[in-house]
Amino acid sequence: MTTYQPDAETVATQTLSSDELLQEATGVNYVEVIQTVISSMAQEDSAMVSQTEVGHLWKFKYGSVEVFVQLTGSTDDDTLTVWSSVLGLPAKDEPQLMRKLLEMNGAETFEARFAIVNDRVVVISSRTVAELSPGEISRTITIVATIADNNDELLQQQFGQ
């Protein structure tokens, strides 16, 4: 009688999580990279993380803003999204606010942009995980956090209710 003995390497691969498989294939562990970037930027031990069925969500304080980082998964079609709220709506002189935000989007926001989400003006950047490098992760988080921190107080002073 012959018994089937599965190849040990195949069995080991089958027990790896999708994050581990991605790291093995690309050499990048996105969760670890994000946590490293956040730990270097977060103030006063403010970083928090939660893991749900839709991925990982981090929150940390940077200057005067809270920054959120969401990683939906580890496949090429999953996304890394970073955002920070800078102003609640409605605002004073909204036409002038919209003009200012559009002008800043064109000249000052690099890969990020100002947007309106749930009646809040946010600085946001989002991209797929496909070919995402540790440097891009760091740059994206840094750009969003810095632009939000540099502009929130000015926008609130000028346009806040």
Where would I find each of the regions flagged by the language model?
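Short amphipathic alpha-helical segments
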Residues: 26-33, 89, 93-97, 136-143, ...
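The feature represents the first ordered module of a protein
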Residues: 60-95
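Well-ordered alpha/beta subsegment
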Residues: 109-142, 146-161
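Short, internal acidic amphipathic alpha-helical interface segments
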Residues: 81-120, 124
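A generic structural signal for beta-strand entry/edge sites
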Residues: 55-57, 77-79, 120-122
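A generic alpha-helix structural signal
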Residues: 38, 98-102, 141
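Charge-rich, low-complexity N-terminal segments
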Residues: 1-66
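Short, exposed beta-strand/loop patches in secreted or surface proteins that constitute
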Residues: 49-51, 71-73, 112-115
